[in-house]
């Protein structure tokens, strides 16, 4: 079992409880190594130290740690130090990916995003560090998983939000299952992901996304991502799947 966290509320007690309950891996977000760069996007009020402590706490409790990082104009020069820190603390996987024009990122995109040259330079640097690091270092493409959906007709991961809703993707405001109403076992047995990808709303969304710039919080006909409740097609998908026996 794995989870993602900003790390700010992690304590020894929380890590111990999560480990006992079966947590194997946690991915923390580390968007800078100075209070200035971190809070330029996180607005945590000087709580970067809590994130750094969370990484150490998780490792002390035998939990595998991955780190995700958002490159932006204030932290671009910190990546050698960020990677040094992660290697020193035993982080197993480090992933950076370009800023996406979603949520606050959309409203502040011009102030935060790197130039194409900066993105290319950082990608090359990460590749070079990966070649000599025991830690897996990747430059991520947030569009890749949507290509995989279209090619395979399956959704190979489960995206659960704070409301117990499963979505097609963290970047699309479409709920395909609700754990408050039905079990995860039913979701798997009924192969709901297959029906979700065939649904016309989902199909139209996936068809229009070819590159990073195609993402937006305000797609026509959809709720504003992170600000309005998702479109919920979960009951419709469940009804269809039960009629067809999940195939």
Q: Would you name each region that the model predicts?
A:
Residues 1, 137-139, 176:
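Generic structural signal for residues in well-ordered beta-strands
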Residues 56-65, 83-88, 117-132, 148-159, ...:
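A short, terminal or domain-edge coil/loop segment
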């Amino acid at each position: 079992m794995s989870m993602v966290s900003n790390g700010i509320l992690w304590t020894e007690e929380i890590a111990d409880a999560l480990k006992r309950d079966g947590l194997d891996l946690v991915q923390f977000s580390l968007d800078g190594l100075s209070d200035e760069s971190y809070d330029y996007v996180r607005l945590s009020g000087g709580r970067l130290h809590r994130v750094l402590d969370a990484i150490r706490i998780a490792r002390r409790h035998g939990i595998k740690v991955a780190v995700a990082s958002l490159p932006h104009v204030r932290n671009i020069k910190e990546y050698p130090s960020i990677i040094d820190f992660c290697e020193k603390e035993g982080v197993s996987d480090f992933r950076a990916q370009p800023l996406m024009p979603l949520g606050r990122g959309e409203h502040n995109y011009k102030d935060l995003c790197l130039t194409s040259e900066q993105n290319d330079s950082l990608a090359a640097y990460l590749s070079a560090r990966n070649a000599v690091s025991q830690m897996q270092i990747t430059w991520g493409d947030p569009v890749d998983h949507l290509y995989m959906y279209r090619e395979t007709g399956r959704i190979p991961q489960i995206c659960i939000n704070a409301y117990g809703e499963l979505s097609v993707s963290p970047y699309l405001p479409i709920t395909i299952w609700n754990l408050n109403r039905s079990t995860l076992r039913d979701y798997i047995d009924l192969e709901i992901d297959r029906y979700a990808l065939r649904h016309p709303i989902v199909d139209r969304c996936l068809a229009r996304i070819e590159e990073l710039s195609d993402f937006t919080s305000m797609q026509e006909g959809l709720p504003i991502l992170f600000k309005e409740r998702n479109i919920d097609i979960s009951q419709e998908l469940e009804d269809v799947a039960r009629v067809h026996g999940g195939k």
